[in-house]
């Protein structure tokens, strides 16, 4: 007698068998890698770890030419202490920066499960708490802490042990092609409660060791990108195989090169190594959840300019919001942020100079503009140059139909960026931006309504190829980014190189500005420049 339930029963058995085989294959990759690193017992015996290392770093979006040679940023030496049982990390840093200026910062970084702390000065742009503390120090923002948690999990010597302990968070993954070679890989979800932080762990088919740990991130210029920790060389310490040379790759480009000098397994580490001042700990931020722009805090640390705030645009301890500051009728300076825009009203539309930091800042600036200039569309977004801190919010303007105006040689770059997917953007979700119009400025761009003329002039300079500066003729107001920070940069005696370049460009254009507003800083009389020549 036929049993109608038997085919379904057989199907379920086959399904369970397939799932079991798949799980076994996943676990085999993890087990092989653990064995290659010295074996399960050796790795599980590691409770604390200490090592010294040196690092070189480059920043791709501060290049002279868009998409060109990366700017060398810093040489660093650091020492890491980790308590794996408690989830504690301390890093003592000496960072020697050469960009954007030459300086050295010596500081310590403490990361705990529910708080982070910086002891000392790590950035040009110090937050309010750091400035007011004696000695200088501040607790990490929730975004910074979440980034630190992810990155220390990525580089953990015990990542494979965590994968073995949490098999339900290990997922099958298609092989990954790197330089024409196919490698086995697994996905690993970092947290049971969240599914937005996932590593792709890629394995070397010959050594069985991990080859890369990859994440998919959002970059404010490039859109969706890969970010890889690459294990280049390994060594043996106390019977355990650990990485001796590592690098970090941003969308396939090397931006950090790390050389580990020594590992100490299970050193005695004091709780004091991981302490946070009690008066600050009680109000310290917990790690952020949800979609996070990981690349911004990672990359701003590379050049030592991170504002350690949950808002990339400004220090939330010191500033509550962006604002429009009137400079003249129909001319506003979007200020209070780390980087600024200039807004100019025409008869039937608006012109905006620069889209700093992220699409959040652009969206907030657009809200302020639409509240003040009701019903007037933003027709042009004029980008002074391609650097991420002044162009990173360009997608929000493209999404509302603005035409991009860029300097000579930058059109291909921005066309490519407008075609790039941006599905991981925490501030903007939408469709294709590929049809956005772009105007190239080879000498000067002018927009006139019969009463007012706005212009953008190409400027020969040493900071960025295709640099533009802006001018509003009827009120004699200029706009400049990076070459001079009006109201911030004190001019004493002779002009520096970039200030001289601005002065020459203004003279060549035959302009007579009275005031300049800055992409950094505030405003200042142009006489500060003209009288110092």
Task: Briefly describe each language-model feature range.
Residues 502-533:
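Divalent-metal (often Zn2+) His-rich catalytic cores of metallo-beta-lactamase-fold enzymes
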Residues 324-371, 467-486:
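Conserved beta-strand hairpin/beta-sheet module of binuclear metal-dependent hydrolase folds
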Residues 175-278, 471-473, 480-481, 486-487, ...:
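Gly/Pro-enriched, hydrophobic low-complexity segments
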Residues 360-405, 508-514:
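Active-site metal-binding motif and surrounding structural segment of the metallo-beta-lactamase
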Residues 263-347, 444-445:
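Zn-dependent metallo-beta-lactamase
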Residues 28, 35, 101-198, 207, ...:
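Flexible, processing/modification-adjacent segments and terminal tails
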Residues 10-21:
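Bacterial N-terminal signal peptides
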């Amino acid at each position: 007698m036929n049993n109608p339930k038997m085919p379904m029963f057989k199907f379920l058995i086959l399904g369970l068998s397939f799932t079991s085989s798949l799980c076994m294959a996943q676990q085999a990759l993890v087990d092989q890698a653990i064995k290659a690193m010295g074996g399960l017992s050796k790795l599980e015996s590691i409770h604390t770890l200490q090592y010294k290392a040196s690092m070189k770093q480059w920043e791709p979006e501060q290049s002279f030419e868009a998409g060109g040679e990366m700017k060398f940023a810093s040489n660093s030496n650091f020492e890491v202490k980790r308590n794996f049982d408690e989830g504690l990390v301390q890093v003592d840093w000496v960072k020697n920066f050469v960009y954007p200026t030459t300086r050295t910062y010596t500081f310590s970084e403490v990361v705990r499960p529910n708080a982070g702390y910086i002891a000392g000065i790590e950035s040009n742009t110090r937050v309010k708490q750091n400035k007011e503390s004696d000695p200088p120090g501040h607790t990490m923002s929730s975004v910074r802490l979440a980034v630190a948690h992810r990155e220390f999990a990525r580089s953990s010597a015990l990542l494979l042990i965590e994968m073995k302990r949490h098999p339900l968070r290990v997922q099958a993954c298609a092989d990954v092609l790197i330089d024409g070679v196919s490698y086995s890989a697994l996905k690993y979800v970092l947290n049971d409660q969240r599914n937005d932080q996932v590593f792709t762990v890629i394995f070397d088919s010959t050594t069985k060791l991990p080859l890369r740990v990859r994440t998919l991130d959002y970059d404010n210029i490039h859109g969706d990108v890969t970010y890889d920790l690459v294990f280049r060389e390994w060594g043996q310490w106390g019977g355990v195989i650990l990485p001796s040379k590592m690098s970090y790759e941003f969308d396939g480009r090397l931006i950090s090169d790390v050389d580990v000098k020594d590992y100490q397994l299970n050193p005695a580490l004091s709780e004091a190594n991981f302490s946070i001042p009690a008066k600050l700990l009680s109000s310290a931020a917990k790690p952020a959840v949800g979609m996070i722009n990981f690349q911004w805090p990672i990359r701003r640390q590379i050049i030592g300019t991170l504002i350690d705030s949950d808002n990339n645009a400004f220090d939330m301890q010191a500033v509550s919001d962006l604002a429009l500051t009137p400079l003249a009728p129909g001319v506003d300076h979007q200020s209070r942020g780390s980087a600024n825009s200039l807004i100019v009203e025409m008869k039937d539309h608006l012109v905006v100079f620069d889209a700093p930091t992220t699409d959040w800042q652009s969206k907030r600036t657009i809200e302020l503009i639409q509240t003040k200039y009701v019903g007037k569309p933003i027709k042009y977004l004029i980008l002074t140059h391609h650097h991420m801190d002044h162009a990173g919010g360009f997608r929000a303007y493209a999404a509302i139909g603005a035409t991009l105006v860029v300097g000579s040689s930058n059109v291909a770059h921005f066309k490519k960026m407008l075609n790039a997917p941006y599905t991981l953007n925490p501030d903007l979700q939408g469709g294709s931006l590929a049809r956005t119009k772009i105007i190239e400025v080879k000498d000067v761009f002018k927009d006139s309504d019969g009463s007012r003329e706005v212009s953008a002039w190409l400027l020969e300079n040493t900071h960025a190829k295709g640099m533009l500066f802006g001018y509003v003729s009827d009120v004699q107001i200029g706009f400049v980014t990076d070459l001079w920070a009006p109201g911030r940069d004190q001019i004493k005696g002779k002009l520096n190189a970039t200030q001289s370049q601005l002065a020459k460009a203004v003279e060549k254009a035959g302009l007579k500005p009275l005031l300049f507003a800055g992409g950094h800083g505030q405003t200042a009389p142009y006489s500060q420049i003209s009288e110092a020549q």
